[in-house]
Amino acid sequence: MGSCGNGRSSEYDDPASLEKMEELVLPLKLMPLHTNGRLYDMRLSSPTATCVINSSSGSFDPIYRAWTKKYPSALNAFDHIVAYGKGKKIALFLDYDGTLSPIVDEPDNAIMSDQMREVVRNAALHLPTAIISGRSRDKVFDFVKLTELYYAGSHGMDIMGPVGEHDSVTNHRSSINSNRKQGKGVKIFQAGTEFLPMINEVFRLLIDKTKAIDGVKIENNKFCVSVHYRNVEEKNWQLVSQCTNDVLKVYPRLRLTHGRKVLEIRPVIDWNKGKAVEFLLDSLDLASCKNVLPIYIGDDCTDEDAFKVLRDDKRGFGILVSSVPKDSHALYSLIDPSEVMEFLKRLVMWKNEEASHNK
């Protein structure tokens, strides 16, 4: 993803200009995540990132500008957002890939910048903060390297938080205490541990089944298996789909979902990033609290479950990170990780100012 430029032009905020652009936008519908891995679904979930700023004129792509009428920039709408947070505790939920780090061709190279790490650390010191990713929990921690956060890997099926913060995590029947390489005790909640042997078996089968496909990468994310096809020629995407489905059809307790140039095999259980948000709010003793404003920032279709939870409950805001116009359950948008970093900086600054005024 990339904005191909810095800052938002004043033209972006001109309601009259947006009205003029409205007829250029085709109706955008949030498509369901099909479970058959067809080529159509792979293309649908993997739109090509676009340059949303014209390098010569500095103006926004007209279709993207019109799209932001429905999903306003969270930076431009910042005062409106924090107005809802006045006097409330803000709970921050963040995706990793494409949100805190750029999307890269090699998944193992999705490195978080030192500047972003410091911004996230500062946010976590002032706000309860969690990272919810499709990656394995340990892998996300290896990227982020911050002990102040909650981590939810495998789309929220594997959750870790510092011991001593909130007892409700360890009191859950699926929770355990552990001492990890982070250097301190942690609380761990895991949904669907009975699926682990099955996931490991599918991982091995997929490595063997796809070994002849150039560019494919199979990733074991503990509670799910990811089949990355970002580096596969599009003419071979159907082959990736077929190999994945050939393995999956003998595992009725597993299902297939789509991410950005990735097929993901997960347990058939009622758990997703939205459920993880609800669980974490409960663990933070914020589930029934009216004085809380949850904010979820993510870029992937798997983040839609979290956006939907906040929207349906009318209790928080989802912010979609995208340079491509697409329908979403989010209420606001940001273009790329650089705008995410700016939003987080402003959020912490605002929270500090509010705290100083209340003293």
Curated annotation (Swiss-Prot):
Pfam families reported in the protein's UniProt record: Trehalose_PPase
Top-level enzyme category: hydrolase
Keywords annotated in UniProt: Hydrolase, Stress response
EC number: 3.1.3.12
A GO term for molecular function: trehalose-phosphatase activity
Presence of keyword Ion transport: no
GO BP: any one term: trehalose biosynthetic process
Pathway(s) annotated for this protein in UniProt: Glycan biosynthesis; trehalose biosynthesis
Catalysis performed (reactions): alpha,alpha-trehalose 6-phosphate + H2O = alpha,alpha-trehalose + phosphate
Needed co-factor(s): a divalent metal cation
Domain of life: Eukaryota
PANTHER family assigned to the protein according to its UniProt record, in alphabetical order: TREHALOSE 6-PHOSPHATE PHOSPHATASE, TREHALOSE-PHOSPHATE PHOSPHATASE 10-RELATED
Function of the molecule: Removes the phosphate from trehalose 6-phosphate to produce free trehalose. Trehalose accumulation in plant may improve abiotic stress tolerance.
Stated family: Belongs to the trehalose phosphatase family.
Protein name according to UniProt: Probable trehalose-phosphate phosphatase 10
Gene name of the record: TPP10
